[in-house]
Amino acid sequence: MEGFAMKIELTSDQALVLSDWLHRVMHKEDFSNVVDDRAVWSALLRISGNLETGLPQIFDSAYSEQLEAARTRLIAELGDFGQAIP
């Protein structure tokens, strides 16, 4: 489907947390083993690049605090989803 483009909308909290996560995991060997289709890297690199260039918070001196606040808000929205079952 050449010429078709998809738009994905994220909240600023989602974008910040996803950007941080991608930055931490994309270059780890374990993650490379999970991505078993080289073509998927095209989308991952596009998403990561767009997040990095579109998030001014990354360069803010209070980045760590903003990231932690975003994580806290998103986890609160999730409720019990994704929690380990005892």
Model-derived segments and spans:
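Positively charged, low-complexity terminal tracts
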Residues: 1-12, 16-86
